[in-house]
Amino acid sequence: LKAEEKKKQLEEFIRRFSANVAKSKQTTSRKKMLERLNVEEIRPSSRKYPGIIFTMEREPGNQILEVENLKAVDADGTVLFDHVNFNIEKGQKVVFLSRNPKAMTALFEIINGNRKADAGTYNWGITITTAYLPLDNTDFFNTDKNLVDWLSQYGPGNEVAMKGFLGRMLFKQEEVEKKVNVLSGGEKMRCMIARMQLQNANCLILDTPTNHLDLESIQAFNNNLVGFKGNILFSSHDHEFINTVADRIIELTPKGTIDKLMTYDDYIHDEQIKEQKAGMY
């Protein structure tokens, strides 16, 4: 890698993660690298990009998801959202926002059948198959299976195929025998993404998918979602990720939704929307 490219990579990392507390150590160390960046010091980057490719087995029909008058209340009685109505159109990639991040998790759990709504209904189209990436994946890893056996539960394919999948997600040959309950947060996330790829769903539900991922994984994930032909319903803290993937924004509030077909940048700078929001929380 030429010094220029390396410099660009470091700047991209710092720009993307300077506000992210979990990544602050990495950001600081990359700022230092940037400061002492001399051409002689640059060695080719050994960072690899995982092969993330989502494919749909079935073309979706026109009825994707219809939500009517949905309400969710937190365990402590806080209303997370109420009067939520929307209809997802074919091919839309929708980011859900709220001042309370628990609102998005509650919505995704409800439409995935893992939580009961406090009011209202939702209805999936008959051609829709979903793959869900939950915020908390702890329950998936309470087992002493190794990576190959763990992944084999979620899709057809022999051991060689599973090892190939794990290899694409950057697990080395000797790592696939590792027990899944000792994996790091980033490794678990890569396993969950591999699991989702096996499902060949035409609608992806992603609750804060960039948590625990490094820059290379986020970029690979990001690029594949941009080209994905199905529907995506997601939440994220990553500005760039939202801006490049979402073509519709639905904000969940205790007094209904704000629902706009626009980019995230336009949404957060729109004065009318700011005024509308002020009265909804």
List the predicted regions and their residue ranges.
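ABC ATP-binding cassette signature C-motif
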Residues: 1, 57-281
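Flexible nucleotide-interacting loop at or near the entrance of a catalytic core
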Residues: 1-82
